[in-house]
Amino acid sequence: MRGPGVGSGLSGERGLSGKEAGADTEVAELLPFLVPGARADLQAAAAQHVLALTGVGSGRTLLAGQTALLRALIDLAVAPIPAPSRDASRALVNLAADPDLHWQMLAADPELPVRLLRCVLDPQWPWAEELAAVLANLSREPAPCAVLTEKLVAAEPERLGLERLVSALCMPSYNASAPLHYLGPLLSNLSQQAEVRAFLLDPDRCVVQRLLPLTQYTDSSVRRGGVVGTLRNCCFEHRHHKWLLGPQVDILPFLLLPLAGPEEFSEEEMEELPVDLQYLSPDKQREPDADIRKMLIEAIMLLTATAPGRKQVRDQGAYLILRELYAWESEPDVRMACEKLIQVLIGDEPEVGMENLLEVQVPEDVERQLQELDQQEQQELAQERRDKGAPRT
């Protein structure tokens, strides 16, 4: 395969080897053109070729385990213009989208997370969005996510860690050349780690309060979904529920508002709702992304894990919003999640000693039965989705 627009090949004497060539030959031909000091036009063509390879599974397999080439690609991605850092960055996005390559990328450069984050958090870096996507992809799997978290926590004293990441996420104008929407899913993935949740839920930092307005961020479902996923993960920490639901944070209206539609309520019902959910305009739209709607419901469900949480969610009229959502919802799995939450809100309280649903010890035989029921439910939902998409006869 020849580099795009290079005529007879990168070296001027021989062309790039084809996909069918062995990995050793491929790396031998590509690597000299990717390293610093290579001629600019040949370096650009080599980066384009690697980008093309990363677009298909066979190409990613070809590159897998080639430590020197991966390291050169990483160096190129963080190199200043005029280096072809954009193509190198996009190649890293594709590589990081393959979970099987995460460890190879981290092995090629153990400092990869910090190096990429340094560019992502540079307000002048033109390809910061691509590198944010690399970090978001890398952090999807638990083990690489833990490694990434360790690096970010270690970088915190230099303000290259979580605090600066949150600041950039909460400031859409942070980088005029890059929207940084992928900081949303990056933070969501990182918040699977206990250390990150502890940072986010630190009352002295006011991080959660800064994230809440982004549940209504209309310019990007990627950013919005990442923030909602982060908030949902924070809701697993039931010891913070009182603070989250209390006046210092007041999280519930921010979770309910995207689920609310234009439906009218009686005056009596209206008084049950938080002020922000009263008298909504007739053109009020619900969250358009089904996955985000489900995460919002899941976050509220987690807040009902304790008896005080259930009471506060009930007292703020959540049932009214969910009742109308259930009547409107067409996605089977979201509708099922909504139904389960409604059942918690209208059902009887658990018996003494079982008030905290996150701490209840479930016997193994009951757990197996629940897993079987869950599998059956998932099969029914899958069938419902298939039936929904089937052409009419």
UniProtKB/Swiss-Prot annotation:
Residues 382-393 have a biased composition (Basic and acidic residues). Residues 1-21, 374-393 are annotated as: Disordered. This is Protein HGH1 homolog. Keywords: Phosphoprotein. SUPFAM superfamilies: ARM repeat. Disulfide bonds: none annotated. Residues 1-12 have a biased composition (Gly residues). Belongs to the HGH1 family. It comes from Rattus norvegicus. PANTHER family: PROTEIN HGH1 HOMOLOG. The keyword Phosphoprotein applies. Gene3D superfamilies: Leucine-rich Repeat Variant. The keyword Phosphoprotein applies. The modification Phosphoserine is found at residue 221.
